[in-house]
């Protein structure tokens, strides 16, 4: 991205992207040793990450991040960078290959005072089609990433009594689009 801004002689965009990328990296490093961070902080990191990806792929997708008015994001904690890999998969494996502009929706909804439902939905090409487009090396890399997230959730659930539950589903009958639903408990 920075290379394309520089080659197009758009120094302002290159500087803005680098500044925001640096901010994201600093936050990731600050939080990397913590088991949990406030949900509010995770949302800020996610907003910054999605903004950077949209900056790179603005012709590929639009996005929205919606937070339920009743949800107090300061009352919940979440493992840092838990949501980002799911959003990354939506962009890189679903929306990026779509011919027309796609849609990414991220919603935070209070189910009850003790529970939040986080939904990440894209109308991309779907997991099956994405898998067909990958090289063998890409298949190994992706399964490692999602496998690591699943292991991390399992360990945290053992330590903290089933705090996080994740489901990944196709949203259309033709297997296009993906929805990740994550339930987070206090």
Over which residues does each language-model region extend?
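A short beta-strand-to-loop micro-motif at the C-terminal edge of the catalytic HATPase_c
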Residues: 165-177
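Hydrophobic core positions in the C-terminal catalytic ATP-binding module
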Residues: 63, 104, 176-184
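Short, proline-centered helix/strand-breaking motifs
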Residues: 79, 85, 180-186
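Two-component histidine phosphotransfer core
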Residues: 1-165
